[in-house]
Amino acid sequence: MMKSRMYDSTKLSFIRLLKLFEDSIDDVVAITRAFSIAYVIHRGKFYDNIKSEPYINHTLRVALILANELKVKDRDVIIAAILHDAFEKTYTNTFKEELLKKTIGEKALNLILSTTKFNIKEMESNEYCKLVLKSSQIVRYLILANRLDSIRILKNSIRKDKIQRFKKETQEYFLPIANLTDDNLVFKLSVAMYELK
């Protein structure tokens, strides 16, 4: 399934992730299956058009933030992190919901769908925060881990407009959500924001 050259950073991130679940062969198999799907979906895509940064690395980092930094050991949550962008409209090689449900299970699929129903660009900050705060804590973890990785990777970006937009959105939307979700996430987001200066 993975014929094209895989970047060393991708391999290392995937190995780090699997090591966190090495006590359960079922978890390793399920996470590997999700990674294979994500690899197909994101093949040829690069994060922020940086040719040295395959998009799949972003999804792996989100999974690692959850599993390693936040100590989330639920494989369905990790699968949802790996596949959180599976339904991006810009992708031509997206998987259908029914096929994903059969492959990764209903819980993981529902987590993915729960994280994608909030469109930050179409809502006011109060409305967005209220809707996200009504979701489960684990959905908020997924949303915040995604934002945390996006902020961390931006410190290497030359796009000042994107940096300013993400800083503003994080301040208005994500820090208030993190404040009502997990102090550790507030700290991590605040540090990442500070490092953008």
Predicted regions and their residues:
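Active-site helical microenvironments for divalent-metal-assisted chemistry
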Residues: M2-K197
